[in-house]
Swiss-Prot record:
The keyword Amino-acid biosynthesis applies. Catalyzes the conversion of 4-hydroxy-tetrahydrodipicolinate (HTPA) to tetrahydrodipicolinate. This is 4-hydroxy-tetrahydrodipicolinate reductase. PANTHER family: 4-HYDROXY-TETRAHYDRODIPICOLINATE REDUCTASE 1, CHLOROPLASTIC-RELATED, DIHYDRODIPICOLINATE REDUCTASE. (S)-2,3,4,5-tetrahydrodipicolinate binds at residues 162, 171-172. Belongs to the DapB family. It is found in: Cytoplasm. It comes from Methanosphaera stadtmanae (strain ATCC 43021 / DSM 3091 / JCM 11832 / MCB-3). Its EC number is 1.17.1.8. It catalyses: (S)-2,3,4,5-tetrahydrodipicolinate + NAD(+) + H2O = (2S,4S)-4-hydroxy-2,3,4,5-tetrahydrodipicolinate + NADH + H(+); (S)-2,3,4,5-tetrahydrodipicolinate + NADP(+) + H2O = (2S,4S)-4-hydroxy-2,3,4,5-tetrahydrodipicolinate + NADPH + H(+).
Length: 273
């Protein structure tokens, strides 16, 4: 059995991950972690998320290192916020616990800190801004279209999410922009345009527009537009429920347990893309 720990265990994503892990024949949840000094600490995890008693107590993250050393999970799954995720990965690395990270909003410096901890302690990590299988196929298609069309088409990326999402643009939109830039041999830091306002003038050559919409309960919509003279190609992915991301997490855990042969992998590795 693969022993799984989950951060943000009482939240929307955390609870869905736990319920799905518990439904697998080869996995079990052995730890649930909430924010430091959480009032939920000590509660039975299963009862908290509506599964019934599991015999696993929720812990506050201030006790993470101690509990990891005691419980010894095989992997910790993190869908929280960037700052917390970095500290969690560092602690997991010190304790020899592998990680699957779907947290978004991580900047380059935070990713560098994560990568160093993972490599220095020789653990395995699957890190992706979007774990959904369909989104990663979407990434692959976006890259192929960019490569075929070249620099003659203007590229605009539009993402939409629920009004509670904290970071913008989404990690998925940023990754799509990176893929476009890589395939067009562009420096994204120079060519990215995050929204427009006022008299911005003519669109600069090779600019990559990135736009964020927030409203209601939108789970996640992403559109990459390749706009040419007289025609437009749109590559679209829409997530209707968070289960799409959870299913990807299960794939990542299984891949890490049986096939992963390097310290840091992403969902392209998991899916063989």
């Amino acid at each position: 059995m693969i022993r799984v720990a989950v951060t943000g265990c009482a939240g929307n994503m955390g609870s869905k991950i736990i319920k799905t892990v518990q439904a697998q024949d080869n996995m079990e949840v052995v730890m649930g972690i909430e924010m430091p000094n959480s009032p939920l600490a000590g509660n039975d995890l299963g009862q908290q998320i509506g599964l019934g008693p599991m015999g696993v107590e929720i812990i506050g993250s201030q006790d993470l290192k101690t509990e990891l050393e005691k419980v010894k999970p095989d992997v910790l799954v993190d869908f929280t916020i960037a700052k917390a995720a970095v500290e969690t990965v560092k602690i997991c690395a010190e304790c020899g616990v592998n990680v699957v990270v779907g947290t978004t909003g991580l900047n380059d410096e935070q990713l560098d800190v994560m990568h160093k901890a993972i490599k220095d302690n020789d653990i395995k990590a699957v890190i992706s801004p979007n774990m959904a299988t369909g989104v990663n196929v979407f990434f692959e298609i976006v890259g192929q279209v960019a490569k075929i069309l070249g620099n003659e088409y203007d590229v605009e990326i539009v993402e939409a999410h629920h009004h509670n999402k904290q970071d913008a643009p989404s990690g998925t939109a940023k990754r799509a922009a990176e893929i476009v830039a890589e395939n067009l041999n562009l420096d994204l830091k120079e060519k990215a345009c995050y929204g427009r306002e006022g008299m911005v003038g003519k669109r600069p050559e090779n600019e990559i527009g990135i736009h964020a919409v927030r409203g209601g309960d939108i789970v996640g919509d992403h559109t990459v537009m390749f706009c040419g003279d007289g025609e437009r190609i749109e590559v679209i992915h829409r997530a209707s429920t968070r289960q799409a991301f959870v299913n990807g997490v299960i794939r990542a855990i299984n891949y890490q347990s049986s096939k992963q042969d390097k310290n840091i992998a992403d969902m392209f590795d998991v899916l063989g893309l």
